[in-house]
Design a protein with these regions (language model features):
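Positively charged, low-complexity terminal tracts
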Residues: 1-93
């Protein structure tokens, strides 16, 4: 028999409710985790506005959820254009 679904309450503070703007994401990894640095790039400098560290299994689930949500978005609002690669002035490496 399937277990009943449990409701989970999630708290979010006032600062997190504001959100963080990012126009660039830098991804790096170790054997055990992937690190996503969300960056607000205003040349000549970028600022990491948020860092998310995940294990590979959770990141794979996140990718699936992002793909499903993008498909739903495009169904409702039409196709999106992929952002162009940054020019030389936009490099953070």
């Amino acid at each position: 028999m399937a277990e009943p679904t449990k409701n989970v309450n999630i708290k979010i503070g006032d600062e997190e409710l504001k959100g963080r703007y990012a126009n660039l994401v830098r991804i790096s990894h170790t054997r055990e985790e992937l690190i996503l640095d969300f960056i607000n790039m205003v040349p000549p400098q970028g600022t990491v506005t948020s860092r998310v560290i995940m294990n590979p299994a959770h990141l794979k689930r996140l990718i699936g959820a992002l793909q499903a949500n993008l498909a739903l978005y495009e169904k409702n609002f039409g196709p999106t254009q992929e952002a162009p690669e940054p020019t030389d002035g936009g490099s953070v490496n």
